[in-house]
């Protein structure tokens, strides 16, 4: 596979994007007729094409990494940009896993006869055309393409300019897979230009694009949420909480508070604030202080919590809002379950929040009153993930209440339409 060394110059970006949109709309109608076997054949063929193109993928990725270093990208961004052999393996396995998932399209439920004699039910259908805007990670190209294809959606993928060579090499493999299954190449289109005007055009084409999914930093997501003329599936922050109730099992509380913070620091489902009931504080905070100190976690605590956290610095109002994505944790002691719930609903981001308790009553109240897309009892917030929820994979996590909420897998990329059977019925 020959590699081009630069992105093509496109004189009229808006016209180019509209052409992509028109082709995607036509392809989405064809995909509505595609069989599950045909979609799975394409996914397996994409996996084979990626496996055969390892050298090409690594060469393209080296060019992106070299350009990134020359442009001053920090090490964290370079790490996300890198396509290691293990990450290529993961992309290949991900395609095969999506192929093995049940196809939600065409599922019919709730069929019933009504007094008029008609039969009414619901059928699950694809959304149509999904636009994905993302940064850095080339593997998102494969993840998004596979989920959209399996759920019957055409997709337009606009990756970050820093990954343009990697994404174009991956796109070649995707096209090979589509061709092997006799599917239109426009079922998955990767935007070829790095011009930022492409994003503005993509999010302003309601006649072609049914939904936008942004994956990236807060600034990108805020801009798309503000400017998009089509629905957006997104979350802005991951300010996640663990609340240790007065009725908590101490060993569970320590294990969960440790894992939720220190298993990984950068994911959006990592705990950023620990709330502890005043009765539980002397039982769990000293042990947690030792654990966090051994792992280099900086604690920013309220005045009462600092009685058990000698090395903690005083928390400010900003700390309760903070998504650190780093070994930093805010800690607050509260007097009641009510105060904990109020804190979460005031400062949280409606992402994922957990309670540690042996009280069924307290657990049920927490589940009912915390306004988040995932609410947990006696489990680490790190479980808030499509794979861990048995969805197989996810396109992202939504903290909105419409259309999808929480990890968005195949079903979240579909909607339902009513279907009606009659036998010459007319309304009187």
From Swiss-Prot:
GO terms for biological process: L-proline biosynthetic process. InterPro entries: Ald_DH/histidinol_DH, Ald_DH_C, Ald_DH_N, Aldehyde_DH_dom, G-glutamylP_reductase_CS, Glu-5-SA_DH, GPR_dom. It catalyses: L-glutamate 5-semialdehyde + phosphate + NADP(+) = L-glutamyl 5-phosphate + NADPH + H(+). It comes from Chromohalobacter salexigens (strain ATCC BAA-138 / DSM 3043 / CIP 106854 / NCIMB 13768 / 1H11). Belongs to the gamma-glutamyl phosphate reductase family. Pfam families: Aldedh (PF00171). One of its GO terms (cellular component) is cytoplasm. Pathway: Amino-acid biosynthesis; L-proline biosynthesis; L-glutamate 5-semialdehyde from L-glutamate: step 2/2. The keyword Cytoplasm applies. It is found in: Cytoplasm. Catalyzes the NADPH-dependent reduction of L-glutamate 5-phosphate into L-glutamate 5-semialdehyde and phosphate. The product spontaneously undergoes cyclization to form 1-pyrroline-5-carboxylate. This is Gamma-glutamyl phosphate reductase. The keyword Oxidoreductase applies.
